[in-house]
């Protein structure tokens, strides 16, 4: 085991502060509409130009092991906020730095940091309550477009495309962001449930021009295992032929005489059919088949149920208005499942998303959720250069997350105004003792920092702007604030300067959590740098007489 270095008390906190400041100072310059760009140099490839706080934070790794602990903890604030809310990473970083700075100041004066932390937690709880009171539901398309525009660093083109996507697939629908092969940014919407499996034989094609197999009002057989023996398949085929409707077979694989029988009957016009492989692998395949069964009102014939293929009846098959199968995709449109069962399945997947700790699992669960909820929207981001494309793609991804957060929990006035208004409620909040009161005062001061930083990045005096915003709140209403893009004081809702409540809430909660943890730390432990062993080269060899 490598030797460790340990530092304590003031020395430990000073190192944490140095690390926090190095990261936060690089990130906070990007805050607001007039935030500056940060250029990230790479060992290979072109440098990346970005205004995205979490992208900047992720690049930072400090040489000093103790300072790096502080930097990594604040990086965690940015990453966690991005994961939960999709935006607000820079705000969270600014808040964490401000809370930690103020906390260090009171700790140096001899306050009990454990009581100070209790005061901080109490104040954050109150701030969150106030944010909920300030929050306004997002229902109108115009508001969705405004949120998306702001989250994409005031790019109205991206705002409009995201609003279109949300309108098409709804709040639970999946919006994926891909790189376009052209300079244009476009939107493509796939209605219904689509999975990445195409027909098993080109002989199933019904539209030679588009190379698609289109089945109108088909039955859908959902089977977990391989189908090779035609005898197993024959009973259900005969029932489907009598019904006069087409058949889609979804199975692990369809091969041999079973596939040949389907193809021959399809070509002769006896039974319009198509066979595709089931999506996914292992347990994930079972989940997908279960989703398809719920969506189409059928039954997934799995080994667990003990049902043999030859004993399957028509009422076990799923049904849909239409199925379109091409070489690579299968799309089920208008599944005829029970809406209540679909709703229950959606709720079950939502719970799994909340409980999972794996990013990969979360992504796959969200894909399943979207497919059940009614569609997938693909935003293809285009730009003139590779560097611009990467930066724009980051912004679009952020904006999609933030817009979903706004639809989920509502919106508050942007530009740091919501936190300033919420902080006014702390005037009446009393701690159990003097040190807790110091913690409450820390939050009261810290939550006003984002507004000051936005003003400063735009070239204005943050303290002067803050005073004016507090004054306007009393005179004209809580939604009045400072538009850093124009330098004017406006009604933030009317000017379209808004933040998703979830973003602001997550930012303050995560920032206070990490800053409080750092304040109460009394020791830091890090690996000692390894001493490099001197290589013995031929020149180092002793000379022989």
UniProtKB/Swiss-Prot annotation:
GO MF terms held by the record: ATP binding; ATP-dependent protein folding chaperone; isomerase activity; unfolded protein binding
Transmembrane segments: none
Binding partners and assembly: Forms a cylinder of 14 subunits composed of two heptameric rings stacked back-to-back. Interacts with the co-chaperonin GroES.
UniProt superkingdom: Bacteria
Protein name in UniProt: Chaperonin GroEL
Organism annotation: Aquifex aeolicus (strain VF5)
NCBIfam families hit by this protein: GroEL, PRK00013.1, PRK12849.1, PRK12850.1, PRK12851.1
Catalytic activities: ATP + H2O + a folded polypeptide = ADP + phosphate + an unfolded polypeptide
Cellular localisation: Cytoplasm
Cited function: Together with its co-chaperonin GroES, plays an essential role in assisting protein folding. The GroEL-GroES system forms a nano-cage that allows encapsulation of the non-native substrate proteins and provides a physical environment optimized to promote and accelerate protein folding.
Residues annotated for ATP binding in this entry: 30-33, 51, 87-91, 415, 483-485, 499
Lineage, broadest ranks: Bacteria, Pseudomonadati, Aquificota, Aquificia, Aquificales
């Amino acid at each position: 085991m490598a030797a460790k270095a340990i530092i304590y008390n003031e020395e430990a906190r000073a190192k944490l502060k140095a690390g926090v400041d190095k990261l936060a100072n690089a990130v906070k310059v990007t805050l607001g509409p007039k935030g500056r760009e940060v250029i990230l140099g790479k060992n290979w490839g072109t440098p990346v130009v970005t205004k995205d706080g979490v992208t900047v934070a992720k690049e930072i790794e400090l040489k000093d092991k103790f300072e790096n602990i502080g930097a990594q903890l604040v990086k965690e604030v940015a990453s966690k906020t991005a994961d939960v809310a999709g935006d607000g990473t820079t705000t969270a970083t600014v808040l964490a730095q401000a809370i930690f700075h103020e906390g260090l100041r009171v700790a140096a004066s001899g306050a009990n940091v454990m009581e100070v932390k209790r005061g901080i937690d109490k104040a954050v709880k109150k701030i969150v309550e106030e944010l909920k009171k300030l929050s306004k539901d997002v229902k109108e398309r115009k508001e969705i477009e405004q949120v998306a525009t702001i989250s994409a660093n005031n790019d109205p083109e991206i705002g409009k495309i995201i609003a279109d996507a949300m309108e098409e697939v709804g709040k639970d629908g999946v919006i994926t962001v891909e790189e376009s092969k052209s300079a244009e940014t476009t939107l493509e919407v796939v209605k219904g449930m689509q999975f990445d499996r195409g027909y098993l034989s080109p002989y199933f094609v019904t539209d030679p021009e588009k190379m698609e197999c289109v089945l109108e009002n088909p039955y859908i057989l959902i089977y977990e295992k391989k189908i090779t023996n035609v005898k197993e398949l024959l009973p259900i085929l005969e029932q489907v032929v009598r019904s006069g409707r087409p058949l889609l077979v979804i199975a692990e694989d369809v091969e041999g005489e079973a596939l040949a029988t389907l193809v021959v009957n399809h070509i002769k016009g006896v039974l319009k059919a198509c066979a595709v492989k089931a999506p996914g692998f292992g347990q994930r395949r079972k989940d997908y088949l279960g989703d398809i069964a719920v969506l189409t009102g059928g039954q997934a014939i799995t080994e667990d149920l003990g049902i043999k293929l030859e004993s399957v009846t028509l009422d076990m098959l799923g049904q849909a208005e239409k199925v379109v199968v091409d070489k690579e995709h299968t799309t089920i449109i208008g599944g005829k499942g029970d809406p209540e069962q679909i709703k229950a399945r959606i709720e079950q997947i939502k719970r799994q998303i909340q409980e999972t700790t794996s990013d990969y699992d979360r992504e796959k669960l969200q894909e399943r959720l979207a497919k059940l909820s009614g569609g997938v929207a693909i935003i293809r981001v285009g730009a003139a250069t590779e560097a611009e494309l990467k930066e724009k793609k980051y912004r679009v991804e952020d904006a999609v997350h933030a817009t979903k957060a706004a639809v989920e929990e509502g919106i508050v006035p942007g530009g740091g105004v919501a936190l300033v208004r919420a902080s006014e409620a702390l005037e009446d909040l009393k701690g159990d003792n003097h040190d807790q009161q110091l913690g409450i005062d820390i939050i009261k001061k810290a939550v006003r920092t984002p507004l000051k930083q936005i003003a400063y990045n735009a070239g204005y005096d943050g303290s002067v702007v803050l005073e004016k915003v507090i004054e306007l709140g009393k005179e004209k209403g809580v939604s009045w604030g400072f538009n850093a893009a124009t330098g004017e004081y406006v009604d933030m809702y009317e000017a379209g300067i808004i933040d998703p409540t979830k973003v602001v809430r997550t930012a303050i909660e995560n920032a206070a959590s990490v800053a409080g943890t750092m304040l109460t730390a009394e020791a830091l432990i890090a690996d000692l740098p390894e001493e490099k062993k001197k290589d013995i080269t031929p020149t180092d060899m002793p000379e022989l007489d």
